[in-house]
Amino acid sequence: HLLKFNKMIKFETRKNAIPFYAFYGCYCGWGGRXXXXXXXXXCCFVHDCCYGKXXXXXXXWDLYRYSLKSGYLTCGKGTWCEEQICECDRVAAECLRRSLSTYKYGYMFYPDSRCRGPSETC
């Protein structure tokens, strides 16, 4: 599903997830810690929390269906887990689009060592 998430991000932001979001700030990409540094990093934090809620179904790697309808991403029918993961990805991609005006290139490839302070809680 990471490829599908990348396609959603590309559709919403016109940017490829790699390199623009895969290592952005303290929460985009694998894992996350400390405080979310920018609006785009907050989208990634919420996405991580969303995946955490759906992880009980061990669904993080489930393939899902989605389509574009009238310029909007729409998740298709599938198992409960597939639908949940699709919604997590769809909401995050839309959040990244809304935060485009605050995107900071200085947070691309942000080193984990600079992620300080208390971690956010879901």
UniProtKB/Swiss-Prot annotation:
One of its GO terms (cellular component) is extracellular region. Optimum pH is 8.0. Inhibited by Mn(2+), Mg(2+), Zn(2+) and Cu(2+). The active site is at residues 47, 89. It catalyses: a 1,2-diacyl-sn-glycero-3-phosphocholine + H2O = a 1-acyl-sn-glycero-3-phosphocholine + a fatty acid + H(+). Gene3D superfamilies: Phospholipase A2 domain (1.20.90.10). One of its GO terms (molecular function) is calcium ion binding. Its EC number is 3.1.1.4. Expressed by the venom gland. GO terms for biological process: arachidonate secretion; lipid catabolic process; negative regulation of T cell proliferation; phospholipid metabolic process. Its cofactor is Ca(2+). InterPro entries: PLipase_A2 (IPR001211), PLipase_A2_Asp_AS (IPR033112), PLipase_A2_dom (IPR016090), PLipase_A2_dom_sf (IPR036444), PLipase_A2_His_AS (IPR033113). Ca(2+) binds at residues 27, 29, 31, 48. Optimum temperature is 35-45 degrees Celsius. Disulfide bonds join 26-115, 28-44, 43-95, 49-122, 50-88, 75-86. It is an enzyme of class 3 (hydrolase). It is found in: Secreted. Belongs to the phospholipase A2 family. Group II subfamily. D49 sub-subfamily. Snake venom phospholipase A2 (PLA2) that displays neurotoxic and myotoxic activities. Induces inflammatory edema by mechanisms involving mast cell activation and arachidonic acid metabolites. Increases plasma creatine kinase activity. PLA2 catalyzes the calcium-dependent hydrolysis of the 2-acyl groups in 3-sn-phosphoglycerides. Monomer. This is Basic phospholipase A2 LmTX-I. It comes from Lachesis muta muta (Bushmaster).
